[in-house]
């Protein structure tokens, strides 16, 4: 199995963590990663752009002048697309831009992105990362200890509790940092809370240079992506 250094918030090595080769050390499939990002960006589009055709713009329906004997060009309507204030030919109309990707391809894309970070030595795993209260200064000090203070960094935390939520709030004022809580507390199946990694996505993992996970987050990712029966329910 692949191994990664386990660090504390002071940046000190406190151990070595074995991680799944199937999740963190596969040959990246860049085509599937592109498909995932294309799906993400397409699903963000509102699709509300709209223009009026010649049948929708205001204006009379009569012919502006006789067909012949005026010396002027032939026209049948002032709403023609070639007229000022006329309709728009082939303009945009509201449409649904959303795309879908099957679960196997989603999981392959996520494993590929995680493997890219691991192979480029841009994956940091902490034993834990919680703050007693939201304070940007505290999170900034932790990133300095990891030598990531001036790097674009994505932090992914496993669930919503007070300590992790304080980290998320603390990261809002740091321009190069994004904090994701990969959990949906409202999700349940048969009365039991299902394991999910909502929020973890390929676009953010590629956009940010470094990826910071907690030990619990690694376990959660491996539980969801480490077997074909798991469900990687992300955006």
Curated annotation (Swiss-Prot):
Q: Where is this region: Disordered?
A: 45-75
Q: Superkingdom, according to UniProt?
A: Bacteria
Look up keyword Membrane and say if it applies.
no
User: Would you kindly state one Gene Ontology biological process term found in this protein's UniProt entry?
Assistant: translation
Q: What Gene Ontology terms describe where this protein resides (cellular component)?
A: ribonucleoprotein complex; ribosome
The UniProt keywords, alphabetically, are: Ribonucleoprotein, Ribosomal protein, RNA-binding, rRNA-binding
* Compositionally biased tracts (Basic residues): 65-75
Q: Which GO molecular function annotation, any one, does this entry have?
A: rRNA binding
Q: What name is this protein filed under?
A: Large ribosomal subunit protein uL4
The organism named in the record is Thermotoga petrophila (strain ATCC BAA-488 / DSM 13995 / JCM 10881 / RKU-1)
